[in-house]
Amino acid sequence: MASVAISEIVTQSANLRAELKEWERAFAAQNGGRKAERKDIKKVPEIAAKYKEYSRLKALESSSPNPDDPKSVQLEERPKKRKRAFKDGPDAIQNSSTPRKTAKGALETPSKNRLSSSHPSQVDPYISPTALRRLFSPSTHRTPLKTAIGPTPQRDGKALGLFDLLSESGGSTATPSADRVASVRAANVRTPSKRKTMDTIMEEDEDGEEESPRLGRTPASSGKKWMLSALFATPTTLRYSAMVEDGNHITERNLGPPTDPEGTARDVAGPETPSFLRRSNSARYATSHSANPSLSPIAVRKPPQFVGKGLSALVQGLRDMEEERLEDDLDVLREIEAEQAALNVEVADSQAPAEIIGRHWKKKGQKRTTRRVRMKPVISKPASKPQSASDDENRHQAAGEEPAEPAAVPETQQPRALDAVFSEKQNEEFDDEDDQVSLHTISEPDLDSDPEYGEDIKPVTKSKSFSEKMKEAIGVAQPQPTEDPAKPSKPVIEAEETKKVRARKVNPEAHANYRSLKIRNKNSKGRGAGRFRRR
């Protein structure tokens, strides 16, 4: 009864699972491929009840002591996928190789162990899975992987690689798997020959040895052969093609001119660059086969040594990575600076600039080098009323005298007095010529050494101040006497007229309110003994 109850539980759980799967597919089709979640299941109470029933049945099934294999239950809704049958039955494969002892479960996918009594917290994470532990353990396989790894393909005493099975013309020896298995089965019933079934395709020189059971392939054109051999051929293929050419042209090499033994030795030795640093080894094969006049056994190729990166290569790689990172950072900084420069464009101010309040600043330079003199205007008294000419004539006629020439009207500024002042000043200035420093000589009056200029001027014993001299020079003219001039005064007037009054030279560019400063040394011993002399 227990077995019948367990089988019913398994059948019910399988049917419920099929129904739930159908509902999940329909839900995914309605919602664009989205799988049903817990909240979607709760929205449909019928499906939620089925899920609860299914989980209850699975719990009963797992708690049963001897559960039946669920794979034995046949489902009507989901029939099993039909596997492809072999052509000659499954036992025909055993004839293709020597029967060996099969390892149980060597390459099988491990099935989920539902009766795992160990809790996940008790499982060691560093323990490898059971299948991998069985696959690589020496106790299971005394000879490693007999059924997985076959014999290494060799040719002429050397191991062949993946690309060594290709022919010179570029054709492929691989055939569809079913045809290849059929040809292998056909070959097993015969006495084995030298040529193996999985060898390379026969070249044109070997056509007479043995014919393939299959139809021959279309021969490649000469252009295709050259392109494949020159551009797309691997180094091993180039070496084999060179060996074939050597066999075909042995007589031509024997009849050719003798070669240099030193050059031959150099070619055999090969270039000085190590093989792991050479970019391509195809040229090496082309030069090496020309030195051998006949076919010679090729040394067994050693297993390839994988040369790792050196320290310098690792350091250079790290530097390149750092430079790329720095370049990225610099690009980001340049973009930020460009954005800031675009934001900081100067815009014309809409407000008018405020007027400058106060005195405008001016850089201080050299101060005034000339002394400013303020000349006050002189108020002249009104001159006496001149007598008319008719009265003078009548007076002279009454006296019985000829009318005299009109007397010269005196000027407000007497030239004689001015000349005396300036000559005295000039004499004082030229006493000490070494200490004289003149900045503005244009404003000085030009004085000539005329003997008539200072004849009547007597040297002044006592020096007068500048203000006194100016007062004397700019003096108020005395009014003329009203009485008639005496007769003895005529020759004096005539003598004065005979002397021409020399005109005073005045520089038109000189300013009236400025005079040149005579700056002298402080410690000079000349008259004045000061920086600016007397003031």
Swiss-Prot record:
<keyword id="KW-0539">Nucleus</keyword>
<dbReference type="Pfam" id="PF11719">
    <property type="entry name" value="Drc1-Sld2"/>
</dbReference>
<dbReference type="InterPro" id="IPR040203">
    <property type="entry name" value="Sld2"/>
</dbReference>
<feature type="compositionally biased region" description="Basic residues">
    <location>
        <begin position="517"/>
        <end position="535"/>
    </location>
</feature>
<dbReference type="GO" id="GO:0031261">
    <property type="term" value="C:DNA replication preinitiation complex"/>
</dbReference>
<feature type="compositionally biased region" description="Basic residues">
    <location>
        <begin position="359"/>
        <end position="375"/>
    </location>
</feature>
<dbReference type="InterPro" id="IPR021110">
    <property type="entry name" value="DNA_rep_checkpnt_protein"/>
</dbReference>
<feature type="region of interest" description="Disordered">
    <location>
        <begin position="170"/>
        <end position="221"/>
    </location>
</feature>
<dbReference type="GO" id="GO:0006270">
    <property type="term" value="P:DNA replication initiation"/>
</dbReference>
<feature type="compositionally biased region" description="Acidic residues">
    <location>
        <begin position="201"/>
        <end position="210"/>
    </location>
</feature>
<dbReference type="GO" id="GO:0003688">
    <property type="term" value="F:DNA replication origin binding"/>
</dbReference>
<dbReference type="GO" id="GO:1902977">
    <property type="term" value="P:mitotic DNA replication preinitiation complex assembly"/>
</dbReference>
<dbReference type="GO" id="GO:0005737">
    <property type="term" value="C:cytoplasm"/>
</dbReference>
<keyword id="KW-0131">Cell cycle</keyword>
<feature type="compositionally biased region" description="Low complexity">
    <location>
        <begin position="405"/>
        <end position="415"/>
    </location>
</feature>
<feature type="region of interest" description="Disordered">
    <location>
        <begin position="58"/>
        <end position="156"/>
    </location>
</feature>
<dbReference type="GO" id="GO:0003697">
    <property type="term" value="F:single-stranded DNA binding"/>
</dbReference>
<feature type="compositionally biased region" description="Polar residues">
    <location>
        <begin position="278"/>
        <end position="295"/>
    </location>
</feature>
<feature type="compositionally biased region" description="Basic and acidic residues">
    <location>
        <begin position="68"/>
        <end position="79"/>
    </location>
</feature>
<comment type="similarity">
    <text>Belongs to the SLD2 family.</text>
</comment>
<feature type="compositionally biased region" description="Acidic residues">
    <location>
        <begin position="445"/>
        <end position="454"/>
    </location>
</feature>
<protein>
    <recommendedName>
        <fullName>DNA replication regulator sld2</fullName>
    </recommendedName>
</protein>
<feature type="compositionally biased region" description="Polar residues">
    <location>
        <begin position="110"/>
        <end position="121"/>
    </location>
</feature>
<feature type="compositionally biased region" description="Basic and acidic residues">
    <location>
        <begin position="455"/>
        <end position="472"/>
    </location>
</feature>
<keyword id="KW-0235">DNA replication</keyword>
<dbReference type="GO" id="GO:0000727">
    <property type="term" value="P:double-strand break repair via break-induced replication"/>
</dbReference>
<keyword id="KW-0963">Cytoplasm</keyword>
<feature type="region of interest" description="Disordered">
    <location>
        <begin position="358"/>
        <end position="535"/>
    </location>
</feature>
<feature type="region of interest" description="Disordered">
    <location>
        <begin position="249"/>
        <end position="302"/>
    </location>
</feature>
<comment type="function">
    <text>Has a role in the initiation of DNA replication. Required at S-phase checkpoint.</text>
</comment>
